[in-house]
């Protein structure tokens, strides 16, 4: 099967090289009297396609919101019909000996039915669930992204040292993101750090707010980094999220979906973008004599691969695929030799991935793609099924049902062998 290229563009040299190798193998096996199907198709490319069409509409003075979901989908189908043929024409010009009679598009009706069936199967087996967790959030697209869709780029920035005052003085906390202090719920120190033992269990004043937050002890804190004091923002940092769960802290979300500060921030900072808020917060800290200095620092900035936008850790309810058991099964196949890596040294990378794997966020807040086959009753109870009729029949539901608005990314199904054209 040709890994389906996106309908958003045209083939590049990599595609040409890949398809030439596959064509050679296909023709060779046919000459050896094998029955060969070389499957061809294109990918609907949810995020990329939606972005292209939104930019086209922007030039016409329209937005997807102004059109509504149904009309926006029609615009995408029109664009797909116009652009999608570019790739297939290129493949034909290459002379690729694919079976054109079986050409597929990942939004074809039979493919969508298969995707829904697999979602239901995984849900029934307890492998798909819905839960609140931190995600990589793109404020431009206003959707969650998986780690694979994140580009971590090293950029020059600063570390700011901020004073958190208490009854007998202050703690100095080092941070690369002073704007997130508005969502701080604690200052953490290492339980073995003698400098701060007497302060554990007491409170400090959160700068620029009227809140006080506790000083807690956690082994995660590195005594040798900075001052050994760590600001804990459970709703806006992946490591802090885990600390927050351990200490039962409140998860205070200070962001709107568009990346501006919300009503949980002091009024002065509300509706500001994060970098705008950073500038003002640093000025305010300095004026209040709460800024203890800064120093240049290089750090990895997570950006969305498609938009280049700085991503925010964002607490939201999403659909997830449990990966631990799948990772264990995949690792067994490599260890017993049923799956082999060439060259063999890639096994080490593979096992590292499998060991540190997290549950995969598969839902996206998009208007193009495979819609999640889930419905909700008036009490927000969720029902999963291939259709509303099936949900009603299986669960004996007679009241109003509302379809889940979100879409999901089933690309991993092909890689796992769960879905074939």
Regions found by a protein language model. Name each.
Residues 164-168, 191, 205-210, 377-379, ...:
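Short acidic, glycine-rich loop/turn motifs
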Residues 35, 178-258, 286:
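Catalytic alpha/beta core of large soluble enzyme barrels
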Residues 34-35, 115, 149, 178:
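Catalytic alpha/large subunits of respiratory electron-transfer oxidoreductases
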Residues 2, 14-17, 21, 41, ...:
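Secondary-structure capping and boundary motifs in well-ordered enzyme cores
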Residues 54-171, 225-383, 388-398, 404-407:
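Residue patterns forming the tRNA-binding/recognition surfaces of aminoacyl-tRNA synthetases
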Residues 1-51, 55, 59:
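N-terminal cofactor/phosphate-binding cores enriched in small/glycine residues
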Residues 7, 14-16, 41, 118, ...:
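Conserved phosphate/anionic-ligand binding catalytic regions in large, soluble enzymes, centered on
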Residues 1-11, 96, 101, 221, ...:
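Short, conserved helix/loop micro-motifs enriched in His/Cys and acidic residues
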């Amino acid at each position: 099967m040709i890994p389906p290229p996106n309908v958003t563009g045209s083939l590049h040299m990599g595609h040409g090289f890949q398809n030439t190798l596959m064509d050679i193998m296909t023709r060779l096996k046919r000459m050896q009297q094998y029955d060969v199907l070389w499957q061809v198709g294109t990918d609907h490319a949810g995020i990329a396609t939606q972005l292209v069409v939104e930019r086209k509409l922007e030039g016409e003075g329209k937005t997807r919101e102004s059109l509504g979901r149904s009309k926006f989908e029609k615009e995408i189908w029109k664009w797909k019909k116009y652009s999608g043929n570019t790739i297939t024409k290129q493949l034909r010009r290459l002379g690729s000996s694919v079976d054109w009679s079986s050409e597929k598009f990942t939004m074809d009706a039979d493919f969508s039915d298969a995707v829904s069936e697999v979602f239901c199967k995984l849900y029934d087996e307890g492998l798909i669930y819905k839960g609140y967790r931190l995600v990589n959030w793109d404020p431009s697209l206003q959707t969650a992204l998986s780690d694979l869709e994140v580009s971590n780029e090293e950029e020059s920035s600063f570390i700011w040292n901020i004073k958190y005052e208490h009854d007998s003085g202050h703690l100095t906390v080092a941070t690369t993101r002073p704007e997130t202090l508005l969502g701080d719920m604690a200052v953490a120190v290492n339980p073995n750090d003698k400098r701060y033992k007497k302060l554990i269990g007491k409170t400090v004043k959160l700068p620029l707010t009227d809140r006080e937050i506790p000083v807690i002890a956690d082994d995660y804190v590195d005594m040798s980094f900075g001052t050994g004091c760590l600001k804990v923002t459970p709703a806006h940092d992946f490591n802090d999220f885990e600390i927050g769960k351990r200490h039962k802290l409140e998860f205070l979300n200070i962001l709107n979906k568009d990346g501006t500060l919300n009503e949980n921030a002091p009024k002065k900072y509300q509706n500001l973008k994060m970098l705008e808020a950073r500038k003002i917060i640093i000025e305010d800290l300095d004026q209040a004599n709460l800024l203890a200095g800064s120093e240049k620092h290089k750090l990895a900035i997570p950006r969305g691969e498609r938009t280049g936008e700085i991503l925010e850790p964002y607490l939201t309810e999403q659909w997830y695929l449990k990966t631990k058991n799948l990772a264990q099964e995949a690792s067994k196949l490599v260890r017993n030799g049923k799956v082999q890596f060439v060259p063999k040294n890639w096994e080490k990378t593979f096992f590292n991935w499998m060991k540190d794997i997290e549950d995969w966020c598969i839902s996206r807040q998009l208007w193009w793609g495979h819609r999640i086959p889930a419905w909700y009753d008036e009490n927000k109870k969720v029902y999963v099924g291939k259709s509303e009729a099936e949900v009603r029949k299986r669960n004996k539901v007679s009241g109003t049902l509302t379809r889940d608005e979100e879409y999901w990314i089933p690309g991993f199904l092909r890689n796992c062998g769960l879905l074939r054209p």
